[in-house]
From Swiss-Prot:
The active site is at H152 (proton acceptor), D362 (proton acceptor). Mainly expressed in petioles. One of its GO terms (molecular function) is acyltransferase activity. Pathway: Secondary metabolite biosynthesis; terpenoid biosynthesis. Belongs to the plant acyltransferase family. The gene is L21AT. This is Limonoid 21-O-acetyltransferse. Monomer. Its EC number is 2.1.1.-. It comes from Melia azedarach.
Length: 423
């Protein structure tokens, strides 16, 4: 792709942050979140005829959005576990792309997609980088790609999706944005964790891993939900897609040179609506926990049973669970955070961006043709809604030797399309 950076500047909040809001405390959930970045890429096939007008429009509305999300324009102080809300702003990079966007949409390629980002998230963590960095890419055909990188320590995927959606709301003048700051640090205060020896900062982002895109369309998911009904309960879209992915991973692990005894899976769960009273759905921070599944490889693989285990693991993550796990620090009892286990296991993560408002990011020229990311992952899958809301797009990151087995799994072959066109 022929891309040329044309400008770079800092966008600051349109109004100064009041003195009494200058310090934003991190919660224990933020504290436990790895020092990594995640990204969002939005592709628009047509915007306006005037790039200069579009640029000014985006900068002005971003500035106003940062006034609501003022910690994102601040500086993370690791030693104090706070964000200094000093209004330092966020970098805003612009680039011209001579290629036609149809080339990108025809065959999505992670190496090409990551050029649309202000930096490559997998190339290491830099504590000095801003909490958010934006790159707007103008295609000669009139299309546009907005790429954003976020510091995960400060926010989760739900926050990021609402941030981009609300940026669009402000850009369109389509309504007021509710208060996004919620003091979860009072409920889940940060702690001294210096005694923990294991770091997961680079656990998900390793050079020897390979990330590939698999799409389950709506009809395939409907078929799977019928086929994998268990004890009369029809699994959800998320449950059945996760079960098929984990099933393929289990099968691949059995064929590996040194197969583990057990697959441990962590299912990322949004806590906002599970708390009592519920947190605002759009509030800032890492407000997530994990459902846990332990699957011995000697156990017979049944996708219906696996989907049911996923369902039950998520069901357990409620208000009481969160208050004990984080508020009373029960997470310290997890073997993966310290003590050695006799069991030879493999860990895998499933995180879902489904039902987030990513596809509602409209800046005045319509919703995106495609919304997703270009993360290079390891032992993790990230799920997104397809643009029609019926299918699910899975980005799966595995060691290369395991990816070859995974993508040849009969169920994956039967129900997915590997990296299909977006056109």
């Amino acid at each position: 792709m022929n891309l040329r950076i044309t400008s770079s500047e800092i966008i600051k909040p349109s109004s100064p942050t009041p003195q009494n809001l200058k310090s934003y405390r991190l919660s224990i959930v933020d504290q436990l979140t790895p020092n990594v970045y995640f990204s969002i890429i939005l592709l628009y096939t047509k915007t306006t005829e005037n790039p200069t007008k579009t640029s000014d429009h985006l900068k002005k509305s971003l500035s106003e959005t940062l006034t609501r999300y003022y910690p994102l324009a601040g500086q993370l102080k690791y030693d104090q576990l706070i964000v200094d809300c000093n209004d330092q702003g966020v970098p805003f990079v612009e680039a011209d792309v001579s290629n036609h966007m149809s080339e990108l949409l025809k065959l999505p390629n992670i190496d090409v997609l990551e050029q649309l980002l202000p930096f490559k998230p997998h190339e290491g963590f830099n504590a000095e980088r801003s909490n958010v960095t934006v790159q707007v890419n103008y295609f000669g055909c009139g299309g546009m790609a907005i790429g954003l990188c976020f510091k995960h320590k400060v926010l989760d995927a739900t926050t990021a999706a609402f941030f981009v959606k609300n940026w669009g709301v402000i850009a369109r003048g389509a309504g007021e944005i509710k208060d996004v700051i919620y003091d979860q640090a009072s409920l889940f205060p940060a702690r001294d964790l210096s005694f923990l020896s294991k770091s997961v900062d680079e656990e998900f982002l390793k050079a020897e891993s390979e990330t590939k895109r698999f799409v389950f369309d709506g009809s395939a998911i409907a078929s799977m939900r019928e086929k994998f009904t268990h004890l009369g309960r029809r699994p959800t879209r998320f449950e059945v897609v996760s079960a098929v992915i984990l099933g393929a991973l289990i099968s691949a692990a059995k064929e590996s040179e040194e197969p583990p005894e057990r697959l441990d899976t962590i299912i990322s769960v949004n806590l906002r609506q599970r708390m009592v009273p519920p947190f605002p759905e759009h509030c800032l921070g890492n407000i997530i926990s994990g459902g846990l599944i332990y699957w011995p490889l000697e156990k017979k693989l049944d996708h219906g049973s696996l989907a049911e285990e996923i369902h039950q693991s998520i069901k357990k993550v409620d208000d009481q669970f969160a208050r004990k796990f984080y508020g009373e620090a029960e997470f310290l009892n997890l073997p993966r955070l310290g003590a050695n286990e006799v069991v030879k296991k493999r860990e895998f993560w499933v995180t879902s961006w489904c039902k987030t408002p990513l596809h509602q990011s409209d800046f005045g020229w319509g919703k995106p043709k495609w919304a997703g990311n270009s993360m290079r992952l390891n032992e993790i899958t990230v799920l997104f809604d397809t643009s029609d809301g019926e299918g699910i797009e899975a980005w799966v990151g595995l060691p290369k030797k395991d990816m070859a087995r995974f993508e040849q799994d009969a169920t994956i072959v039967a129900y997915t399309s590997p990296n299909p066109t977006i056109l």
